[in-house]
């Protein structure tokens, strides 16, 4: 069966053979290393959803587009999910209270890697920042063409407690209710 696995690219698919438990992952899961999520084509939120979807299939073997066959499929998918969670923690930690660029964050987070990988690493960091922004945990500010990111505390609607994004005080439903009162 064809399984939509957007994230690496918007139109990425994998193929699952139920009878044998074989999952052909293309670029979503590799035999070694991790897949690059490069915005705007790459979408980390969609990618994580795709990894969970592939895990729910309970494959036995992964046949990646690059690298060796993966015989411990569930362990590899868990490794990918854990890696992204670890990297997100590093991004938030590196942001701290500062306002920083993806390049500055990548230089710190990937300090143990050769400098020539930092440019691509900055793209991966950007994917995490975009995800964090969508979740209301980071914000982007642009001043005179300089784009910087900051961590923000998750906020809740002052009326109902639902999560809200950015610096608003009320969620959309409560805003409408207040206007109708």
Located regions from the model:
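Metallo-beta-lactamase
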Residues: 1-88
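Structural motif
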Residues: 18, 141-144, 165
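C-terminal regulatory/interaction regions
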Residues: 93-154
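Short metal-coordination and nucleic-acid-contact micro-motifs, chiefly zinc-binding Cys/His arrays
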Residues: 153-156, 167
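Short cysteine-rich clusters marking metal-coordination/redox-active sites
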Residues: 157-160, 171-174
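Short functional micro-motifs and their immediate structural scaffolds
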Residues: 162-165, 179
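Short Cys/His-rich micro-motifs in 6-15 aa windows
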Residues: 174-181
């Amino acid at each position: 069966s064809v399984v939509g696995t957007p994230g690496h690219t918007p139109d990425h698919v994998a193929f699952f053979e139920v009878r044998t438990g074989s999952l052909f992952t293309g670029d979503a899961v590799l035999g070694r290393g991790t897949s690059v999520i490069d915005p705007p084509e790459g979408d980390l939120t969609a990618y994580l959803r795709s990894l969970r979807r592939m895990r729910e299939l309970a494959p036995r073997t992964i046949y990646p587009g690059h690298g060796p066959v993966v015989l411990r499929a569930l362990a590899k998918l868990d490794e990918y999910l854990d890696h992204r969670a670890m990297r997100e923690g590093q991004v938030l930690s590196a942001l701290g209270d500062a306002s920083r660029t993806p390049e500055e964050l990548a230089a710190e987070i990937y300090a143990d890697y050769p400098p020539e990988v930092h440019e691509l690493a900055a793209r991966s960091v950007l994917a995490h920042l975009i995800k964090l922004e969508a979740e209301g945990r980071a914000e982007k500010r642009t001043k005179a063409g300089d784009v910087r990111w900051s961590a923000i505390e998750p906020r809740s609607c002052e009326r109902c407690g639902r999560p809200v994004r950015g610096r608003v005080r009320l969620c959309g439903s409560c805003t409408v209710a207040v206007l109708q009162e």
